[in-house]
Amino acid sequence: LKIIDHIEDRVKKDKFISSDELDTILKEEITKIICDSQDDDDFLSIGDNKPHVILVVGVNGVGKTTSIGKMANHYKSLGLKVMIGAADTFRAAAIDQLEVWSNRVGVELVKQKMGSDPASVSYDTLESAINKNIDVVLIDTAGRLHNKTNLMNELGKIKRVLQKKNVNAPHEV
C-alpha cells in the first residue's frame, strides 16, 4: 500500500503521464523501498549462526546456481569460510556447473552422483561444514514449481534433515 500511495501522489502532481513514465516511477519507488529497508552493512549478513545455512530454491532457469557462485565469492571476500552443497542432483550439468564455480571462487563443494537423494547431499554438506568450522553453507536445489507436490515435499525433507544437525537450519531460504 505504501508504494501505491507514493505512486498516486506522484501521478497527481503530473496529471498526465505516459506508460513509460509510470514504469519509471514504479521502478524508482520500488528501488526506494528496497534501499530504505536494507542497510548495506546487513546485506547478506549471516549473524551469529555458524554455519549459516542458505537453501537456494526457485523455479527452473532463474539463475540459482550462478547466484550461489556469486554469493560464495561475496562471503569469501569478507574472509568467511564457505562451502557449497550440490543438492540439485536432477539437472544434467548442475553439479559440473557448481564445480566450476567452487573452483573459480576457491571454496569446497560437497557432491554425490546424479540421481542421489538431495536431502542426503544437504545433510552431508552440513555435517562436513560443522566438522570443518565453515561459516556459510550454500545449498543448491533443483528447480521446481509450486504445483509439483513431490518436489515441494522434497524441500520439506531437506529442511527436516538439516534440522537434525542444526535445529535452526536453514537460516535463509
Predicted regions and their residues:
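Primarily NTPase-proximal linker/entry elements flanking Walker-type ATP/GTP-binding cores
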Residues: 1-89, 94-114, 122-130, 134-141
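Inter-motif core of Ras-like GTPase G domains
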Residues: 81-83, 107, 135-136, 152-173
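Conserved ATPase-coupling elements of RecA-like P-loop NTPase cores
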Residues: 94-96, 146-152
